[in-house]
Structures are given as C-alpha cells and as structure tokens.
C-alpha cells in the first residue's frame, strides 16, 4: 500500500485500551452502541457541511449505517456513508486522545473494576471500545468530497502501535472491521446483533441496516434490512416513548454509561417554536472542573444537526446539563458568533434555565434520595448560581442544601425552606457560619448562645460558600446573618442582665480599658459580650469588614489581602477572664491577655502568626 507507515500510540491511548478491556468486559456489548453512535455523529456532520456544499453528498444523500458479519473470517463490520476522514484526521482521532487532563484522569484509575468502569464511561471511549471484543481492528475511510485515491487505511492490534496507509476507496465514509477475539462468537449471530442494535440504537435518527443473505437460483442475493425506528426521539410524542428509550438516548448524546437522574422533554409552540430534551446526569463528568471542559447542548435547527457543546443556551452554573434543543427560529447557517448576539438565543436560554430549575425542584420534591445524589455530584456547581443569575436567585436558593445544627450531621440535607419553617418566634434572620471544615463550623464558639437558645445555624464549609453568601443576601424575606460578624440581633438574644451582673460589668470597665491600652490598634475594639457560655473570648468582624473566610479565599487565589481588624469580645462570666482582670502584675497580665487573644484568633482563623510564642505562653502559664 502507498504511503504506509507504522506509528506508536500516544501513551494515554495504550493505558486507556488496557483499562477498558479489563474494566468494561462485563458490559462488552456496548462497543456496538459506541460505534453506531459515532457513525450517527459522522452523518450529522455531513448534513451540516452539505448545507453550504451539497456536492459533499456525491449523489448519495441517503445516509445510513450498515452492519454485516463474516462467520468464516470471524469479522464484524460497521460501515457508514457519513463525513469520513482524511489521513491527518485519522491520525488525530485514532492515534491520540485530544482531551486536556487525560493523563491525570487515567492516573486516578485504580484496581476497583466497578469504579473504573463508571469512570471510563464518563470519559467516553468511543472508537476504542472495539478492542473489548476484537484483537485487531481495521478501518477504511475517505472524507466526503475527496478523490477516491485519497482513501485511508488504518489497522491496529491495540497493543502500542498502528499502521496507516493510502488506499483507493470509491465510496465516502468509514468502514470499521472488527477481527473478533476467540470466544466472542456471539457477535457473529444475526439474532444477537439485531437485539443489541434494537436495545441501544432505536432512538437514532439514522437508519441502521443489517445485511441479509439469501440463496436464489444458486446465487447469494444480498439485501439490507432496517432494524431501528430511525426517527429522532425528540420529535416523537412523549406518551409513546418508554423510559428505557430516554435512558439510551441520553447515553448516546452524553457518551455516558449510567442512566440519568431525570429528564424533561418539551415542545413549545407560539412566539418561539422549539423542542428541548434536557437531562440531569447521575454522575459528574471527570473533567467538570477542568477549565477546558466542553459543555452545552446539542443544537439542531429544523431537525438538522448544527453543533455540539452549544454553551450559549445554559448558564455556567448549569453546565452539567446534557441534552439538545431543536429550534425552528434560528437560521440553518447559524454560527457560535451569531448565537452569542442573538435575541432568539437569549430567550431560549432564559426559558431553558427556568425549565432546568423547575425540573430540579420537582426532583427534590418527589424523590429526596435522588436529589441527594444530584446534590453530592453537582451541589458545588449550583452554588455558583446566586452570583451568576440574579433573576433566578430565589429559585436557585430553594435548591440549595446545607448541614446545620438541627441535624447534627455533615450531610448537606437542610433546605432553606426547612430552616425557615423551624425559625423561633420573633427570629428575624437566617443564621449561618462559614469555616474550613464541618467540624470547625460545628464547634465554633460563635454558636454557643444560639445553641443555648435552640436557634438553628447553617454550617457552611465548602470553599465557595463565603463567596456565595456575598450574593445570597435573603430568602423568603429573611436576611442572612453570619454569626461570626457583630450583629444586634445576636446580642438581643442574650438574657436580660440582672442588676448584680450590671454592677459586675461596671467593675470590669477599667479591665477593658487596660486591655485596649495593651493591644492598641491590633484590634478594632475590645468589649464584653454575653454571647458566650463556655469560651472566654472570641474575635468578630464588623458587618462591613472582610470576613476571615473571604480573606482566606483571596490569599488562596494569590491576591493581596487587606488586614482584617477584629473586635475582641470577652466573656465576663468566664473564670479565665475574671482571673486576668484580677492580675495586678503587668507582665503577667500581658501574658494572659495575649493568650486569650491568640486562642480567639486560632479558633477563628485556624492559624497563628507565631504559634511557637503561643505554645511558650501556654506552657509558662500552666506551670505558674
């Protein structure tokens, strides 16, 4: 063959092939779904390119996939007359994996076969799934519009290298021949192959045909029988579509192996005409947090495929939504640039966003267990919503889930509606605290008074929480209040101070002044507080001061952080505060005050500027 060369696979391909053969063998029939799905994509791409260049059809506009097998040679062939590939495309698509983050993804794989199977499913194996059942794969392809002599041959045993060469191929499209491994004879059985295609490919709009051979007058007559419905699933009436069909269609468009959690199929007529089929996956994709992660919906215009990953129809905080939109209002020659500035796009985006939020609200109401699965997978992404989408902030807030002092569990199961329904009589605000961990939030001294009063506090420990709460200012007419910030509503919760206590506080005024003088401008203010029960002192910030957690976020992002000026609050009923107030020796007094301040700062920030000094002070006072 002309131009023949042997090339090595990209290292990630070798690793993926090894993992796939071992992890997916128990569900090996999916190779046929993957290859037919790829053929369907190739047909979609040809239709789209032919909109501007009809000659690409080469006189054959009847697109299809054909499946045949040869029992003597033990081969199974899947052929399409779609867009095809040239030599460079063959090398790019079949010799490398052009996905950022692939290496780190593969390194995360372990020895847990079930887990690896799910992870590879998220990754999307496509063409390489052929090697699950084949010990050699041969590809013959030609790009639509190219000359017959520009065909390409590709072959590999999947062990580290592949051969590529130039061939003559009269018909456009791609033909993939699987040389089956020993023991895979089930895929040479007509009934078995038919049942797999019916199971996985009924929803594909492209006809899938299987070869029929009949003996007539001593000759073998070959014909092709269509075995799928070949009608785009989203164009069918909802009442006619089974759940299994919706599930399989999801796996086709999302290249996922697991069923979705829920979906919404809608046809809208009137001012705008479109059909949408939107899915919520049951698992987050492996690269959800990758900056280059592609997301968005498949876009069809009047049932003609236009593009994948049309991100213009979903806000970023809903980037996990998969599915498609088929619009009658956009032009067939629409581009990403036109979509960006289109009024139609903006209207569709608004309608689809509301549709997804309604779908999630229904899921939360109808199936709390499934909604918890969703929250564990995508809750962090949804928390971006209040900052990004002010118009739908209340709807997003209803979907948020938190840990709280009411459940005494780190599981984020409490909704804001739950919280409001449990608010005490006269309680005006929704109280929360942000911290580095659930344990730090749960054990914060800021909670002592509220616990004593039986008032619920939301415990927020995700890194995004502090940022989110800057935008989520109220819910159901109730303002949010951080318990780590100074606030009159919290002080009002303290018991009425009796006359004796007032006298005792008055007697401590010189002590407070003494502490102020000692600490100077290191703190914003020193004062007594009744919000503590077991802790001698805390630090708080003013309402307009940057919070500790926000300062940490800035620092983690490498940004300069303004110094946070804390209010130093002392518990007049605590024995350590009383002992410090009674200390006459100035050096000893300084040690006690510094220790109390360091304790308060450590509880608030989790770190100290000079931990060794704190330990020295602690040890010295323990033995004094």
Curated annotation (Swiss-Prot):
Q: Where is this region: A?
A: 1-336
Q: Where is this region: B?
A: 337-552
According to the lineage, what is the superkingdom?
Answer: Bacteria
User: So where does this one cross the membrane?
Assistant: none
Per the entry, what this protein does is: Molecular chaperone. Has ATPase activity.
Subcellular localization: Cytoplasm
Quaternary structure note: Homodimer.
Recorded GO CC terms: cytoplasm
The encoding gene is htpG
Q: What is this protein called?
A: Chaperone protein HtpG
What's the main place this protein lives?
cytoplasm
| Lineage, top ranks | Bacteria, Pseudomonadati, Pseudomonadota, Gammaproteobacteria, Enterobacterales
Q: Which GO terms describe its molecular function?
A: ATP binding; ATP hydrolysis activity; ATP-dependent protein folding chaperone; unfolded protein binding
